[in-house]
Amino acid sequence: MEIHAGLSALKKYGNDNILPEDTINAIRDFKVAIKGPLTTPVGGFDYVCLVCAKEQNGIDGKRPEKCVKCGSEFVTKRFRSLNVGLRQILDLYACVRPVRWYNGVPCPVKRPDKLDVIVFRENTEDVYAGIEFEEGTEDAKKIITFLINVMGKSLRGDSGIGIKPISVTGTKRLVRKAINHAIQQNLPSVTIVHKGNIMKFTEGAFRDWGYELAKEEYRDKIITEQELWDEYDGKMPEGKILIKDRIADQMFQQVLLRPDEYSVIATPNLNGDYLSDACAAQVGGLGLAPGANIGDEVALFEATHGTAPKYTGMDKVNPSSLILSGVMMLKYIGWI
């Protein structure tokens, strides 16, 4: 069954309806879906063309009749990411991205085969939650005034504002899914990646809550890195999963210099977005990187890259990411 979002939805429904209720309801009913890349506006323009992704402003406050670049009539109002919208509406809290090298694929590193990880990225919180206030708006001014006058913070008055929520619930269910995967696949470790040395009450809390969940629910199956050295002199006991953590910027170095020390990664939203793409670059690029957005009831599989309108009709874009995402989907539903 084909359902619509983005350009195909605009063609079918019109009226700026780019994420129809029919689409949401169908995914909820069928429980599993796979989608292609969707255009996401980047800047502060009023409109975006869904054919060539050109962002543009209206004329005298009116919608352009045609795209200023390609002439398409499929120009719609600026919108937040449809990918983020789908994840939040359907509560697809785990973005799951396996990264490995395939024999013969050209790569920028000497030993791409050493990297074989699966990234569990929290999908609904962090700075990607979409709680933003544009610079100069009344809402932004209210928040800035509150932060300065009530909270005693120093902040420039001409700032845009974004909120970074990270919750106990969101963290623990993500880490739980990562540990369960490690158990099911007999993988040696789960690494919590965070920037808790700077953001102590969000990313630092993510780290702490992750360890807390591991000890509460998997005490007989896990050992922390601290326990490994304090109690076992660094010698890994048989049958245990190692729970460890790394600072986010250090982790980018680790996957390059010590890639074979990592198997499952659990991380907040922004870190996971950056890290999974960086890992994909080590093994040949995003064209070979599949992905899934998984909740407790619904799973949505996708290519991890965005749209590339400039390559339309040129027969040169790598379809492997979407094909491999299809393989993930078939494994998820138990068909292979």
PLM feature segments, named:
Residues 1-8:
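A short beta-strand-loop structural module common to alpha/beta enzyme folds
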Residues 9-12, 252-336:
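Glycine-rich phosphate/nucleotide-binding loop
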Residues 11-53, 66-150, 160-161, 270-274:
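N-terminal glycine-rich phosphate/adenylate-binding segment common to multiple enzyme folds
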Residues 11-25, 29, 222-262:
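A structured beta-alpha segment of the ubiquitous adenosine-cofactor-binding alpha/beta core
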Residues 25-27, 59, 88-89, 108-113, ...:
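Solvent-exposed alpha-helices and their adjacent loops that cap or buttress functional pockets
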Residues 57-66:
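Short linker/helix segments within small regulatory modules
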Residues 142, 146-246:
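Glycine-rich phosphate/diphosphate-binding loop of Rossmann-like nucleotide-binding domains
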